[in-house]
Amino acid sequence: DSQLNKIYTERVKSYRNRINALQAVQSGDVEPTIDPTASPEEQRATLANHQKNNFENMIMKERPDVRWTDVIGVDDAKNALRESIVYPTKRSDLFPLGWPRGILLYGPPGCGKTVLAAATANELDGYFINVDGSTMMSKWLGEAEKNVAKLFKMARSYADRESKPVILFIDELDSLLGERTNEIGGEVRSRNQFLTELDGINGKGKDTKLYVIGATNKPWSLDHPFLRRFQKRIYVSLPTLESREKLFTLYTNKLKLDGRVRSHTLA
């Protein structure tokens, strides 16, 4: 399906950009455009722009054309996302006590957590920023805590500039916020920065349309201070027999199948 494939195509593109960045580090060609004869101010500006481009290449900002109807099964998760994000955003006057800004999607891999987040952004006609935790922690793309700060700053700018909802989806959340037996200074600072940013959007009285949706296959590995910041936790379960049958029907309806093929048997 072309609509769903767009998500994975963009993710492959982000990984290719990351590989290019790593190869540039190994070859010593990290700053190819800096003119050694330029003034220190010009060199710093060039380097800052280069780092900004590296950072933005790792992030998917274009919203995929994915609707709720494209997400088969997981009805409980869809209803929970509607109640947690969609309804409060559209009718905030009905939620005077506030609503969660941090949502954790957890469950087995390959069950549609990314697609659910993208469909939520489409339902709200908002922005969808997709980044994986391992990219944020990459030592080759600058200091991790600065990446976290830049990520939230960019998301807030989108929300404030056009007053549109922004879904900040962080995949592989455990690689960024998981429990550590030994931590180096950069990891500690990045995790503290993430805590600060989450507290900023979760504060009472905040009228922000920025939502952080984290996804993980290992929720037990997350540190408790971070887990508390995700006020809503939604389990994305394995598809049932009925859901698997609908999936086969959806993805084979454009194929020419042998008359003996039955979706129920495949499911």
Predicted feature descriptions by range:
Residues 58-266:
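Walker A/P-loop NTP-binding motif of AAA+ ATPase domains
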